[in-house]
Amino acid sequence: SVNDSFYAMPVGMDTDVIFYRSDKIHNVPETWDGIINLCRNSDFGLPIKLGLTTSDIQDMMYNIIEIKEAMGISYAETLNLYKEFIEEYKDIENYTDTIAAFKIGSAAMLMGNSSLWKKLNGDTSAVKGNIMVASLPNKNQFVRSYALAINSNSKNQEAAIRFLDFMNGKEQQRRLSRDTSLIPIIRELYDDEMILDANPHVKGIKQSVQNSSSFATVSINGENLKKLEEALIKFFNNEETSMNTGKIFEDLMQ
């Protein structure tokens, strides 16, 4: 129950992973330092989101938080690192779509939502068979959940509750994971052969998801999210310093 106004139940989860082109590189380094060094010494830019639209900014924000937590460095240092790769490999004004760059091979790695697996390795994908997946080299893995909700004032609560129960049943969870690449919310399905065959990334992030209840919850309300987005846009447009932008992150993430 949320504020006694509606009821919500998770139906699937996802997390960020690194997809890589097996025809370009053999494996992904096990640390962020290794990934960064590989990018610095090759023609491949850091596998991160590069645009400045609202959706891009939100992806970039989560990437920055994840990299910062994994490497144990400050927000200011993370922002400088992120910006270095954007400026070295991309033109922000005319940036290449990250997924498109990955598909054509100008990027060897792509840091993205695990549910992208279905899109990248589907029957209509030009790169099917050349896509592998690796877990992020993070100490702290972010796990996101997707939920269905019903209004507490609904006149069809019983039917809605039955539907939520159906969506959380084992067979529906298996089909949902197979068809969408979402991670099931039922832990015993992490070893399900059908799910692993359709989504091999589930095995690689199994431990992260199983331990997710012990992780701190990162919650950013709408007002703070807007402030973070505005701060990042100013930083990437060279209108603000990494120190000041990092301070905004620190203040709003407390």
Predicted regions and their residues:
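Short helix-initiation/N-cap motifs at beta->coil->alpha
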Residues: 33, 90-104
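Conserved C-terminal helix/tail region of periplasmic/extracytoplasmic solute-binding proteins
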Residues: 207-254
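Extracytoplasmic/periplasmic solute-binding protein
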Residues: 3-11, 16, 33-77, 107
